[in-house]
């Protein structure tokens, strides 16, 4: 299905006890407040791109453009519309929204640390490449419970951000590493069968593609056993992913992307 004004329609089935209806409602509230250009990223964006609630997520994440590269201006505007200030963002409609701000950057002025630079590059890329979707969250009765229209990061941009995120997780955030790895695995399995993610990242700016090749080989091949141990600490679906599964999707993706970058 396609909404002529706001792109394809994605339907999420909301089972008892999950937060999809509430998250979608909060996302629509966010979209109706003119905070400027922004896009949905993070775990909820992955769910939308997979069209399934494949895991639990604790909040909504959004990237937004601001002139000074801080989220203070959009946060102030959201507070004026009834939100309350919270860690790294706001609470809106009972949902925590983590706001990450980006601004225009000059590549020569990026941080010397590659992973720090990739935080800026991948989040800026996710905002620039995001596409409009209409998201419908349906309750167990199958009645339409909430609808939102929003720009959502592409599967390729989500893979790049997640590869970077798991590199920087603290040692006590093993559950986050497991979630990041599972998100990338599911996105590659669902959207890179025809090389779509590899093709998009081959055209990404400022070395994103080559960096993703290196990270994917590390996470899904060289250290696939470690990644498997992360997943074993998660849900039954995460724990069911084998080392061979990881190596298959990761190697196909990395090989295809590397070949494209050589052309």
Positions of the model-derived regions?
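Compositionally biased terminal segments of proteins
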Residues: 1-263
